[in-house]
């Protein structure tokens, strides 16, 4: 979604303005009938309409800021990091996070450069459609929406197990049903309810993570019952996990590759911040990109560092049965340090995180499918909306994938979680890879037309090398992350590892013939990959430097801290 600013109106209270004005931008009419645009900014809210006059989104500025933060703190951080630690040890877990951080940096940089030059709706899917091929763009859109829908099933699959930290009197199926109905119903309300819920949940998550980092630092320094921990669990081979201890580097390399999938799932959603900043001024966008990296380093890398310091990789609680919360390294660190009350409080935070993540996945997936229907590559019934502007058919379609959560009732919860995580993470990898490919093509078109990147509103760092690096690494990981299934072939493991790639290729081929038929047009290379001279980098271009921006400096230390975080 693109946020814009209209002068001289303001959004919210004076306090809101001083904190959030960096996300307000100028109004630009749509470049075509399918674009979503800002119709008016008034009454302390941002109201977004599409060309049908049916879909309506009302989000206050404070909602948008906190949703941006909340997207960086999800279930992957609190749950899947334990699996990563047990597989690879603390050092390689940290290296995995730093490795994926470099990919996220490249992806957000690429999106920033493209989205500021051509601030169109539809995010990166439009860029793929313009500069790679129409069929590739449509396939990416479907895969991206599908990954959000799959993630909804993943969230439902673990919510009951997390609650079982307190009691197992109520069966898993009952908890899944309760939250299945609740989260689906919430997304059928006007979007202002979604914004309000996400605002408060993101506030809780932000406070909890910052508090846990402070707590972990104190425990490492000796505040816990075990005294100073320091690097105790990095000595005597503990730093490298079982692979290095048994001198089996092949096993260790496999564990590291598999661990990358966990890291990728944890990081997914960070690209949404760059998309939201698509029509920011150059100064505002640079700030937004810096904040993405700051959030990653604080909320992910720093948390992973302290997890590795406080929890040994071979702690039996990381892999024992009894529910995902009991496997969470955050809670294990608290229990090992002798803090009796905090695990219960933090478990409530994890429940809040799952509810927030499930709510967001249905919202994001439904809007993606709605946009695909507008573009003519999804059933038109997805355009059906309520009087309040909610695309209820797209919401119900996305939410239907929540039924996958019931798989935990008849299967091991960890196995089901890893199935869905792998499918969603691989789909996310494909999206990241084609964002980088789109940027490479974009830079090639600029060079062919003699347009210097120095004239762009925002120039990404380390390009084009960073984009090539991200594309090569992402596609390589996506291809090799399941190669172990060929040593001892298992149909279930093969399906889990590669179904996203298979589905993407099938959709790509299907849409190619949908657009070009089965005649000679279908076999022209120019329809497989758009020639540089035919790539459209003109539609939707706007000189953002001509717009005046009034971003007041923060007035106190709290506002300075808030602007860094939010």
Swiss-Prot record:
Query: At the top level of its lineage, which domain of life is listed?
Result: Eukaryota
Q: Which InterPro entries match?
A: AA-permease/SLC12A_dom, Amino_acid_permease_CS, APC_YAT
**Where does this one sit in the cell?**
Cell membrane
An example Gene Ontology biological process: amino acid transmembrane transport
Query: What is the purpose of this protein?
Result: Probable permease for arginine and lysine.
The UniProt induction remark is:
Expression is regulated upon white-opaque switch. Expression is repressed by HAP43.
Membrane topology according to the record = Multi-pass membrane protein
- Annotated S-S bridges: none
Name a single GO cellular component: plasma membrane
- This chain is glycosylated at 490
Membrane-spanning residues where?
Answer: 64-84, 88-108, 143-163, 169-189, 199-219, 253-273, 292-312, 345-365, 389-409, 415-435, 467-487, 499-519
Keyword Transport belongs to the record: yes
- Select a single GO molecular function from the record's annotations and give it: amino acid transmembrane transporter activity
State the protein's name. Answer: Probable lysine/arginine permease CAN3
Q: Which family does it belong to?
A: Belongs to the amino acid-polyamine-organocation (APC) superfamily. YAT (TC 2.A.3.10) family.
Coiled-coil blocks: none
Tagged with keyword Transmembrane helix:
yes
Q: Which PANTHER family match?
A: AMINO ACID PERMEASE (PTHR43341), ARGININE PERMEASE CAN1-RELATED (PTHR43341:SF4)
Q: Which UniProt keywords apply?
A: Amino-acid transport, Cell membrane, Glycoprotein, Membrane, Transmembrane, Transmembrane helix, Transport
Entry-linked Pfam families: AA_permease
């Amino acid at each position: 979604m693109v946020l814009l600013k209209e002068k001289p109106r303001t959004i919210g209270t004076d306090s809101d303005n001083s904190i959030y004005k960096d996300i307000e931008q100028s109004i630009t009419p749509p470049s075509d009938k399918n674009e979503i645009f800002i119709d008016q900014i008034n009454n302390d809210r941002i109201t977004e309409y599409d060309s049908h006059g049916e879909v309506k989104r009302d989000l206050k500025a404070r909602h948008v800021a906190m949703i941006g933060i909340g997207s960086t703190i999800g279930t992957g951080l609190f749950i899947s990091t334990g699996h990563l630690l047990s597989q690879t040890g603390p050092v390689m877990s940290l290296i995995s996070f730093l490795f994926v951080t470099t990919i996220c940096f490249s992806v957000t940089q690429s999106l920033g450069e493209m989205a500021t030059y051509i601030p169109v709706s539809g995010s990166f899917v439009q860029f793929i459609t313009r500069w790679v091929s129409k069929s590739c763009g449509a396939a990416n859109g479907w895969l991206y929406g599908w990954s959000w829908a799959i993630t909804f099933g993943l969230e439902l699959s673990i919510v009951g197990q997390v609650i079982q930290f307190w009691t197992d009197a109520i069966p898993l199926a009952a908890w899944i049903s309760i939250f299945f109905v609740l989260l689906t119903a919430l997304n059928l309300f006007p979007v202002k309810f979604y914004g309000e819920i996400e605002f408060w949940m993101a506030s809780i998550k932000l406070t909890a993570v910052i508090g846990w980092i402070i707590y972990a630092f104190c425990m490492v320094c000796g505040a816990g019952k075990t005294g100073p921990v320091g690097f105790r669990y990095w000595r005597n081979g503990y730093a490298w996990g079982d692979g290095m201890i048994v001198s089996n580097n092949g096993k260790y390399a496999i564990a590291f590759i598999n661990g990358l999938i966990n890291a990728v799932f944890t990081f997914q959603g960070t690209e949404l911040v760059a998309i939201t900043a698509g029509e920011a001024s150059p100064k505002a966008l640079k700030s937004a990109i810096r904040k993405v990296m700051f959030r990653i380093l604080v909320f992910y890398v720093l948390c992973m560092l302290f997890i590795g310091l406080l929890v040994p990789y071979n702690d039996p609680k990381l892999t024992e049965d009894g529910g995902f919360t009991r496997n969470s390294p955050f809670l294990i660190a608290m229990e090992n340090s002798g803090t009796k009350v905090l695990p219960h409080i933090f478990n409530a935070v994890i429940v809040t995180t799952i509810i927030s993540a499930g709510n967001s996945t249905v919202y994001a997936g439904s809007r993606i499918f709605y946009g695909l229907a507008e573009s003519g590559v999804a059933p038109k019934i997805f355009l059906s909306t309520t009087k309040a502007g909610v695309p209820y058919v797209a919401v119900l379609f996305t939410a239907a994938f929540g039924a996958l959560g019931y798989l935990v009732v008849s299967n091991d919860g960890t196995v089901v979680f890893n199935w869905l995580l792998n499918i969603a993470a691989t789909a996310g990898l494909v999206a990241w890879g084609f964002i980088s490919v789109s940027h490479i093509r974009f830079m090639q078109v600029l060079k062919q037309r003699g347009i210097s990147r120095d004239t762009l509103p925002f120039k990404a760092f380390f390009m084009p090398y960073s984009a090539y690096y991200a594309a090569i690494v992402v596609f390589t990981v996506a291809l090799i992350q399941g190669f172990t299934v060929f040593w001892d072939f298992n149909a279930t493991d093969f399906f889990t590892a590669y179904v996203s790639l298979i589905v993407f290729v099938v959709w790509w081929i299907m849409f190619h013939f949908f657009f070009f038929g089965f005649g000679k047009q279908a076999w022209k290379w120019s329809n497989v990959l758009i020639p540089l001279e035919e790539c459209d980098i003109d539609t939707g271009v706007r000189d953002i430097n001509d717009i005046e921006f009034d971003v007041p400096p923060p007035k106190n230390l709290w506002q300075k801290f808030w602007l860094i975080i939010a």
